[in-house]
Amino acid sequence: MRRRENMDVNKAIRTAVDTGKVILGSKRTIKFVKHGEGKLVVLAGNIPKDLEEDVKYYAKLSNIPVYQHKITSLELGAVCGKPFPVAALLVLDEGLSNIMELVEKKEGGE
């Protein structure tokens, strides 16, 4: 069941990257979140602790939800269609993706 949920989230992330506006990378994510921009932050499961704390701190100040994904940064990069690791990403516009619904449902169920 959990694997199915991860696949749904992965598909939603990819759809958001392809059809919406997504910022990749922890530095750029923090920069945008500090200005209160964005709808959702997605963090890789192996993001360094200091970066995780920074992103979560600024996201909380800006009232932007944070989703901690179970996959590694290399896998998150692959989900985004990139040949490099992605430790954090920020969804500015989800496009045709249902990522916001999936994350809300998943957080409500846990």
UniProtKB/Swiss-Prot annotation:
It comes from the Archaea. It holds the Pfam family Ribosomal_L7Ae. Coiled coil: none annotated. Disulfide bonds: none annotated. Keywords: Ribonucleoprotein, Ribosomal protein. Gene3D superfamilies: 3.30.1330.30. InterPro entries: Ribosomal_eL30 (IPR000231), Ribosomal_eL30-like (IPR039109), Ribosomal_eL30-like_sf (IPR029064), Ribosomal_eL30_CS (IPR022991), Ribosomal_eL8/eL30/eS12/Gad45 (IPR004038). GO terms for cellular component: cytosolic large ribosomal subunit. Belongs to the eukaryotic ribosomal protein eL30 family. The gene is rpl30e. GO terms for biological process: translation. This is Large ribosomal subunit protein eL30. One of its GO terms (molecular function) is RNA binding. PANTHER family: RIBOSOMAL PROTEIN L30. NCBIfam families: PRK01018.1.
